[in-house]
Amino acid sequence: MQKYREQITQIAQDIGFNDISFIDAKPLLKSEQHFIEWRQKGFAADMNYLLKENPINARPQELLKEAKTIIMLTANYYSPCPPRPSLEHGRIAAYATGLDYHKVLRKKIQELINHPSLEGIFKNSKFFTDAVPLLEKSFAKEAGLGFRGKNTLLLSKETGSFNFIAEILTDLELALDPLSSKAVGLEGCNGLRVEPFSPSAIEPPQGHCGKCTRCIDICPTNALPNPYQLDARKCISYQTIENREEIPQELHQGIGEWLFGCDLCQTICPYNRKHGDEGI
């Protein structure tokens, strides 16, 4: 299986995924509890797919009973935002400026699992990208592909937070990556050295961002009431994408020119401001 793992890694990188990790398909019970507590505070707003009592969230075997390994993948989508023609033009989130990422990533994963050199080993597998209520950020963090930032997004020292997350659940027993192996020895946003993230720690992990609060400070609707905590009811992305009702009057000024989504808590992050190459 080690041979296949090396082949999978090389193929994934060749077709555009910037990071890949193999982890045990075990339930993330601490992440599940953290999610339940977040939901109980009303922070999920009226997103019904998050409000349901759903065991899928942190339990891979609910999606694939025979799952033994999860192959976690990330694909960077950073692209310099073109200047608006005038102040009368609105703004949209970076991920929405290109093709439908669900279709793009599904095509790439199909190219990966159907690659001739893999000899059809993915016969009993399922793959997803933001299509089921799986705690993708938690599994990606568990796989060592990054750490949870104060804006609640998955942050990678190499590629920042402008990353799509995808996963392949399989019955293959592939060699597993040491947990958090890719998240050790990072520096905080303010340059301070911080302790490596321990995947066994109760979420949310404290660290890596140091004393930096730029993402919290820049949010015009105060959607980040505390570090590592998002109140979707006040989030511009929720209000302009998910909300099917009238946007509350008190949020109008903060939303401003945003028409679809928002990137403020990402573009202000020092981990994103250093990137110059366009992503997938």
Each language-model region and where it sits:
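A short, charged helix-loop
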Residues: 171-174, 202, 234-243
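Auxiliary alpha/beta "docking" domains used to position bulky ligands
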Residues: 1-182, 205-206, 247, 256-257
